[in-house]
A protein has these predicted regions:
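Residue-level detector of functional hotspots within protein domains
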Residues: 10, 20, 116
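Generic detector of short alpha-helix boundary/capping microenvironments
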Residues: 15, 22, 118-120
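Aliphatic-rich helix starts adjacent to a transmembrane/signal segment
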Residues: 18-47
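Glycine-centered recognition micro-motifs in short, flexible terminal segments and loops
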Residues: 1-17
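Short, conserved structural patches
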Residues: 39, 43, 47-162
């Protein structure tokens, strides 16, 4: 008995390891893309937002300049386009049930799958939240968006200056 493991078992082990490595690679690429999209959107919203402006106001003021910047960013980075089936504003009910928040608003994109939240807490501090999604896709098998996991981040706080 020269071989402890036969050729077919060794091939099965190698294929299994290859599949696991590819899944980890796909997961890390999806997470990186969603993380970069979330941070890019957050930077744009923070640069256009001001104290007391809800998410819809930020996205529509100046002829939609913030929305145009965000859509350009997402288009350039290859973020997943989901025209007509957005998961938008999923976190809205959770945020509205938070007792430390007085006011919560949400704006969702119609072209890309992300949401922008604006919140005012009980101490009259204003901040924005961004929710993007990490996707796992199998385009060779015609399966898009097999799994999607939300990634959420808050902006820095805008304080009321009197």
């Amino acid at each position: 008995m020269r071989e402890a493991i036969g050729g077919s078992q060794l091939l099965l082990i190698i294929i299994t390891i290859f599949i696991v490595v590819m899944m980890l690679l796909a997961g890390s690429i999806g997470y990186t893309k969603a993380f970069k999209a979330r941070n890019g959107i957050l930077n744009i919203v923070q640069s256009h937002g001001a104290y007391g402006e809800n998410a819809e106001t930020v996205m529509t003021k100046n002829d939609g300049e913030a929305e145009k910047e965000i859509l350009s960013l997402l288009n350039n980075m290859g973020y997943n386009v989901t025209i007509g089936r957005s998961n938008g504003c999923k976190k809205l009910s959770e945020l509205k049930n938070n007792s430390s928040l007085k006011e919560v608003n949400c704006w969702k994109s119609s072209d890309y799958n992300f949401s922008i939240y604006s919140m005012m807490d009980t101490e009259n501090n204003w901040r924005y939240g961004i929710e993007t999604y990490m996707y796992f896709e199998l385009p060779l098998f015609g399966k898009n968006d097999i799994f999607s996991f939300p990634l959420y981040a808050d902006s820095y706080t805008f304080f009321k200056v009197e």
